[in-house]
């Protein structure tokens, strides 16, 4: 198995987290063709430069995932670091022949590492520091397993039952259920190689379909770049016609007659120019 060193990644620390995030976001996302090419170089030839590019181009996704676990009292830098470990494991195991984007494959490994980290550290997180908070913590867990998120009426009942303020119940609920967590014991014999055979009961986050969102965003960015390049290949008049007819954000889209008046040509000629321009754009975008 190919080993990807952690020194491949930019260093993270609490003091330079913002600069790390800026650096991670500065790496361009890969098109599906670029990703496939690099993945094949790594998978078939062990190209570590390809591995490095794949990792660096996906650091932003680890940051995105880690933000959904900020409700546990753990440092984001640590969550990101754990997620990066998952990313590296995913990259060195990714088979480009399986027919999915790397982010779809990697998101499970990223979450798995973050979940393990939360599970290891949850017991030392000081969620409840005062007497009333401790009372809430140990009583709310059982109540929430039965009710889930409290509505106003349930909130009032719980506060009365435990003899605390409504605000205290809501605050503890937020601390405990920021991600609707359910913590489970990980078997002592759990090993890294079992990550796919043993399904970790994921801590529910607000982005369970994260990979789909990322792929959609990635595809949208790719299409936008394609469209921009395609438009630049048109002559100025054709480009202006397309913009006025299809890309203008205002409520009023210009008619063929209005454009014809501006250029001193017939509306039929504008229609022909528009049709030809659309054909050129289609060819440029699809190639």
From Swiss-Prot:
Molecular functions per Gene Ontology: DNA binding; sigma factor activity
UniProt entry keywords in alphabetical sequence: Cytoplasm, DNA-binding, Sigma factor, Stress response, Transcription, Transcription regulation
Coiled coil: none
Record carries keyword Cytoplasm: yes
PANTHER family on file: RNA POLYMERASE SIGMA FACTOR RPOH, SIGMA FACTOR RPOH HEAT SHOCK RELATED
Subunit record text: Interacts with the RNA polymerase core enzyme.
Motif Interaction with polymerase core subunit RpoC: chain residues: 78-81
Binding region for DNA: 256-275
Annotated Gene Ontology cellular component terms: cytoplasm
Region (Sigma-70 factor domain-2): 54-123
Region annotated Sigma-70 factor domain-4, chain positions: 230-283
BP GO annotations: DNA-templated transcription initiation; response to heat
Main subcellular localisation: cytoplasm
Pfam families: Sigma70_r2, Sigma70_r4
Subcellular location: Cytoplasm
Highest taxon of source: Bacteria
Protein name per its UniProtKB record: RNA polymerase sigma factor RpoH
Family (UniProt): Belongs to the sigma-70 factor family. RpoH subfamily.
Function text: Sigma factors are initiation factors that promote the attachment of RNA polymerase to specific initiation sites and are then released. This sigma factor is involved in regulation of expression of heat shock genes.
InterPro entries per record: RNA_pol_sigma-70_dom, RNA_pol_sigma70, RNA_pol_sigma70_r2, RNA_pol_sigma70_r4, RNA_pol_sigma_r2, RNA_pol_sigma_r3/r4-like, RNA_pol_sigma_RpoH_proteobac, Sigma-70_Factor
